[in-house]
Amino acid sequence: MGKIMNGYILPHPPIIVPGIGHGRERDANATIEAVKKAAKEIGKDKPTTIILSTPHAPCFRDYVYIMDSGTLAGDFAAFGSPNLKFSFTNNKDLAASIAEKAKLAGVSAGGLAESQKRQYGISDRVDHGALVPLCFIEKELEEFRLVLISTPFLPFRELYGFGKCIQEAVRESDE
């Protein structure tokens, strides 16, 4: 039986990532310390999977997009650091379970077919909204899988219902 250990809402300004700020990170020192503290707590909990919702992933008015590629990768090229790259293993089983539970609850959720991704110009690249916290977490937690979810424009009740689907899927898993 799996369990959700904690939840965090983290800021994600790229300037807090070492090598990107070029001195500007001093202006965000309190943010850096807060993100480091959260990352240390996550590292102590040792979750096998991190479920992360990012406001910069492709989002829809009526659909929760759950990235479904086997490997979730991204970099900071848009912020002048193309060699700062990250790659994570997607927990596809948990992602699929979340999507299935959501559908049963009447919330449209899941991945997208390659043709849909092309149609909408969607890339499976992990965006900075996820990468910034993950680059701090990765320093504290060596091994984990990832479920990456967009932040959709759904009414509050549907979002709450979707959260309950995440909870149910995790409980039924070994995560």
Language model segments and positions:
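A generic structural signal for short, non-catalytic loop/turn and secondary-structure boundary residues
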Residues: 1-3, 141-142
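A short aromatic-anchored loop/beta-hairpin motif
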Residues: 2-110
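Glycine-rich phosphate- or other oxyanion-binding loops that anchor nucleotides, phosphorylated ligands
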Residues: 114-174
